[in-house]
Amino acid sequence: MEYHHFLSEILGKTDLLPKYMSNQLCNPAQSSRKPEKVSFLKYENSLRECPEMPGDSILISDICPLNHEHFCGGIHIPQQENTSPKGRLAHAAADKIIWPCGLKSIKINDRKIEGHIFVKCRCGNLYPTWIPGEENFFFITCCANDTATVKLGKTDGDKCQNCSKFNRWYFPGLGFNSDISQYKTQFFCPACTPIRDLVSNMTKFGSTVFRSPSYTDMLKNYVWKRNLPNNSETAFRALNSPFIQTSITAYSKIDVDVNSMTVTELVASVNRTWNTEFKIIPINRTKVVFKDYYRGKSIIFHDNDHLHNQILLTLTDWHFL
């Protein structure tokens, strides 16, 4: 599968792994407990990618191709100028920038890069769906309060059967409590191993547990103007590769606007007022169905602001506003 095919065709969240043409028979998911949750992006050669470094993070989260506001436990791909990512998208190597929610802008070598068209994260803070002005780095957005990671350590001498790079030890990062300092995978390096297998390897002896906010509370608070603290600066330093942290810094935060409604808050408010059950059902990255039990409409949009405006017009036409 190609990157653009993933964005246009895949609906649900998935664990995206790299698969290299130099080893067509290799399948990193063949021994996985959850192979149906794994998808592959094909690449020509792993040696053309950015080198791995000790301290790099792998985000323990599926990747969601949707770009409008929705409650989601995954990490997201904003609209951007770099449309040719390399390697595993959830691997925060030196060619990627992880942009946590609550962050408005960053500086790259004293050049300001600002996010646009912000939507609500599952923790209630805001993250951008469009980041223009940078071609050299690939951006990934995530939750600053609820993104678990593992960190890459030193090499052990063996080579990965998928990418042919040296295998590395890995250790728990954000979102984990652990009594064991480091772990090792078999056959494949951590960057080519499904995330559920990385976690299973850490938790099978009961030594590692997740440390995260309550999913139930976040889901309940999502339709209200409630948010967890803005921890974007701490998350930005913890998630990104140490190789780029001397030249890339968090510049400004964005706070939740108490005087405006996001699209999900608007729909929830109409449902409470009129005792309706309107839902936004995603079809793909640029199409949703807006409906309740009695009426519905297919909406094609190019960004979240466009979707918000069309839902406002639809609710007005249906005499709910």
UniProtKB/Swiss-Prot annotation:
Top-level taxon: Viruses
Family to which the UniProt record says this protein belongs: Belongs to the rotavirus B NSP1-2 family.
Descriptive protein name: Non-structural protein 1, peptide 2
Species of the source: Rotavirus B (isolate RVB/Human/China/ADRV/1982) (RV-B)
